[in-house]
Amino acid sequence: CALPIYSGNFSIDDVMRWPDYQYEFGQGLPSNIGPAGSIYEGQPYYSYGKAEDGSYASTSGTSSAYGARFDANRLFYQYDPVTQGRASVATPWVAYKNNRKDLFQTGYTLTNSVALTGKSDRGSVRASITHTKNEWILPNTGFQRITAMVSAQQQISRALRINFKSSYTYRKLNNTPALGYNSNSISYFLIFQNPNVNLDWLRPMWRTGQENVKQLQPYSSFIGNPYVILYESENPSEKHSNVSSISANLRINSKFDFMIRSGIQLSADQREQHRPISDVVFGNGFFKKQNVFDYELNSDALFTYHDSFANGLRVNASAGGNMMQQSYDMLAASVVGLITPGVYKLANGVSNPNVQTVIKKKALNSLYFTANFSYKDKLFLDVTGRNDWSSTLPKSNRSFFYPSVSVSAVMNEWFTLPEQISLLKVRGSLAQVGNDTDPYKTSPYYGTSDFPGSAIVSSTLYNQDFKPEISTNYETGFDFRMFHNRIGLDFTFYYNR
């Protein structure tokens, strides 16, 4: 048994490139000109809220930044982070050039791994465990992952070999940041952030005296506070997954082999969505919990035959079968409106949870064969066939067969061609591909309803004579090369229906 082997890796992440944001003009529109009789008469101006005497209007309600040009010598009435309202004293009109960049941080990924290997003259085993910790470029994001793997192989006899492999992964994400154009996305906030807004003004998250009830949104109720998005509107998740397989290979003789194999992929995933009170979409708060369990089990058996004959014919053929089972089970419950701010439990909802379930089960049994013939490396023939039996199709249509055949010939091995021609190979094929459908598409089923003790009739028109999808592809072409492969043309014509 060898000594454990340790390996580690550390990397840092940072924003690679920023858009060329402008910091020449502040919040406002070109039409924001001081009216007659005001202190800003005839000039571009800025005002957080309207003047106390009503002599000029507010310009802080727009996300556009085509207003007054920045000038530290000009004084405007701006936002006051102490009072969380309009300042009583005019302050210099300046830009805050880091009011987007300061929202980000330098992230890192740290990976530690230990592996142990053992060998003998008839087998080997290897085990490893890896821990990965990631802090992303946005605060309160990142993940931890633990992966344990073991693999072993043993030569039981000259003819029989056993292989086993298993991998388990646990992944925990404290918060998966939202993406795209929505109110809980930092990208959305960056679009509407104005150059005259100091990011520090938003750090308190909540209005004074209304903690956990009213988020601080000085400029627009349509844009979430970025720190509330990062620290309160969380999307945590935990996932356990396993991939395992075992196989046995039997060499019957010099021409025949037999293989049997079974493998499983399974995962258990728990996801949550937290939305605080005063969220842009869910003003009274929101909580959702979702559990997903799914697995796929595959078992195969395969006979293989290979032989060469004195006349130049080589044959490789195999025939076997597969049994596949799939299962998907999802249970989700959500509440709109929270009784106690900041408590994310289904029991904390102001009403009964809305429960949703999705269960899908599928089985597919298959028999298949493939045969490859080669004659003196100048004529090739490939033939395949597969028959599936699917549980998702009606009983009368659940069996479907799809074959393929292809032939190719190296013409310069059959005929004497000009020496300038390096290769002329022609080919043609006919192939079919079959496909079934998702579970529960042949008959109507009732769905769950928000109203207790009731169900919903599906609006989908189901087909009790659902047939498998069979697509047919025709292909022909040639590969032509000249002057020792310096010039070539590969042509293919195909038709699919």
Locate the predicted segments by residue.
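Outer-membrane beta-barrel initiation region
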Residues: 102-106, 116-120
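Outer-membrane beta-barrel architecture
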Residues: 113-117, 128, 151, 245-247, ...
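Short, small-residue-biased leader/transition segments that mark boundaries at the very start
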Residues: 1-3
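Transmembrane beta-barrel architecture of outer membranes
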Residues: 111, 143-149, 366, 400-404
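Transmembrane beta-strand segments that form the barrel wall of outer-membrane beta-barrel proteins
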Residues: 8, 129-135, 381-393
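Residue-level signature of outer-membrane beta-barrel architecture
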Residues: 118-120, 131, 154-155, 248-250, ...
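Surface-exposed loop/interface segments of Gram-negative outer-membrane beta-barrel transport/assembly proteins
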Residues: 5-95, 106, 136-141, 147, ...
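Short glycine/threonine-rich loop-to-helix capping motif typified by GTGT followed
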Residues: 395-399
